[in-house]
Amino acid sequence: MAYENLLVEKRDGIAFVTFNRPKVLNALNRKTVGELREALLDARDDSAVRVLILTGGGEKSFVAGADIGELAQQTPVNGKEFSLFGQSVFHLLETIGKPSICAINGFCLGGGCELALSCTIRIASKTAKLGQPEVKLGIIPGYGGSQRLARLCGKGVAHELCLTGEMITAEEAQRIGLVNRIYEPAELLPAAEAMAKKIIANAPLAVKYTMEAIERGTQMPLEEGLFLEATLFGLSCATDDMREGTKAFLEKRAAAFKGK
C-alpha cells in the first residue's frame, strides 16, 4: 500500500514505520492516524514481520502532537469521535501481538507521547523532549495519555506532566520510567534495530505470550494475573518451540524456532 504521510519498510523481520511530515514536525492528523491503522493491520497479518520500529522523519521530531489546524475545528460531538478513533488505533498497536519499539528522535509531545506510550518499549535520543501539553491548548489528552501515563509512571507523574503541560528531557523521562534507554542521535535507530533482532532471535509464541501476560495481567488483580501467567506458561509448554529450545540448550547449540 502507498502511504502519503508514512514511510514503511520491511526487512529482516522488522517493519520500520516512519512518520513523514517533517515540515509540521510529523504532527498527527486524521489521515496519518488512518494510515498508521492500515500499516499496523498489514504488519499484524504479515507472518514475516516479528517486530515494529516506529520513529519520526527528519532530525527534529518523532511526533510533535496533533495537527493544530485540524484540532481547532473539533466540536463536542466530533471531538469525542476524534478521540475514540485515535484511541482505537493506539490500542491496536498495543494489542497487535507483536512487539513495537518507539525510537524517539526529537519532540514527542501530546499525541506523539501518547503514541509512544502505546508501544511496547521506548528508547530516546539525548535530544528528545517529551510531554503532554494539551492543557495549554484548553483540552486534555485524548489518545490515552491520561490513562497510560498514570499506569506506567504513576498518578503523581501523570498529574504533573498533564497539569503543567511542561516538556521534560530524555534524562528525566528515563528517570521516571517513561523511556528505557537513551542514545546519541546517530545511535538511536541502530540501537532499536539491534534490540529488535534480539527479540526476533527468541521463540515467537513465547514472545507473544509474554507480552500478553504483562499487558493483560497488569490490568487484573494479582491473583488473576498469576493465573493468566500460569495458563500461558502451560500453552508455551505445548509448543514445538519449547521442545526445540530446551533440546538446543541441552545440546549446546542455537535454537531454530519456527513459531509453532
Residue ranges and their predicted role:
Residues 22, 123-128, 179-227, 234-235, ...:
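C-terminal long alpha-helix characteristic of the crotonase
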Residues 166-172:
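Acidic, divalent-metal-coordinating active-site segment for phosphoryl/phosphodiester hydrolysis
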Residues 1-3, 247-260:
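Terminal low-complexity tails and localization/encapsulation signals of metabolic enzymes
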Residues 1-55, 77, 84, 91:
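Conserved CoA-thioester-binding segment of acyl-CoA-metabolizing enzymes
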Residues 89-95, 103, 109-163, 176, ...:
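CoA-thioester-processing core
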Residues 41, 56-92, 108, 221:
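Glycine- (often His-adjacent) and acidic-residue-rich active-site loop
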